[in-house]
Design a protein with these regions (language model features):
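Catalytic alpha/beta active-site cores
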Residues: 1-96, 114-130, 138, 156, ...
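Thiamine diphosphate
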Residues: 136-152
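Carboxylate/His-rich catalytic cores and anion/metal-binding grooves
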Residues: 111
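Catalytic core of nucleotidyl cyclases, primarily class III adenylyl/guanylyl cyclases
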Residues: 133
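Conserved, mostly hydrophobic/aromatic
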Residues: 107, 158
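Extended amphipathic alpha-helical segments enriched in small hydrophobics
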Residues: 97-104
Length: 172
């Protein structure tokens, strides 16, 4: 996500995928209730992607991680239920709610049909829906309170497990 969303990275792509794979593999064996990675589409959306691209890139990143650990011999049901996602709440309420609801069905289909998941929890789209960033303005911090409430409403109607909203004066 750093490479796609920000054009920069700490490690090149392949070593990064290997490192995330190491984390997922370790957690599957030693900390099975821990969420080893939060797949992030948020930064990609903040970089100019539309809602469809945000979800698509997020799912492609998650698939790259899944492919890595499955190639090591893990079964999808050993880790998929603990993956989490970080997506952006921005814009039209109906479009955003539809995006998240469609994303849940699509992720379930990917995990079941492409990876052969058998456990229902492997199909869950566990997500944080965050709002702020590009949607807040420096010039009108009081109006950002309304924007934050609006983003929170979208997250709630979308069924997000977690939400992260910026403070009214956190515009950047």
């Amino acid at each position: 996500k750093e490479f796609i969303g920000r054009g920069t990275w700490f490690y090149p792509v392949q070593p990064s995928i290997k490192l995330v794979g190491d984390t997922i593999e370790y957690c599957a064996e030693h900390a099975p209730k821990y969420s080893p990675v939060s797949v992030c589409g948020y930064h990609i959306r903040e970089s100019g992607a539309n809602p469809v691209q945000e979800m698509a890139y997020g799912f492609c990143i998650a698939k790259a991680y899944a492919d890595e650990v499955i190639a090591r011999g893990l079964d999808v049901d050993e880790f998929a239920g603990r993956l989490s996602f970080n997506f952006n709440v921005f814009g039209n309420i109906f479009e955003q709610v539809a995006k998240f609801r469609a994303g849940r069905g699509l992720w379930a289909k990917i995990v079941k049909e492409q990876y052969g998941a058998r456990k229902p929890e492997s199909e869950w789209l566990r997500m944080l829906a965050g709002g702020g960033g590009g949607g807040l303005t420096f010039e009108q911090p009081e109006v950002n309170i309304v924007r934050g409430a609006y983003y929170g409403l979208i997250a709630a109607l979308s069924g997000a497990q977690t939400t992260a909203l910026c403070c009214f004066d956190e515009a950047y």
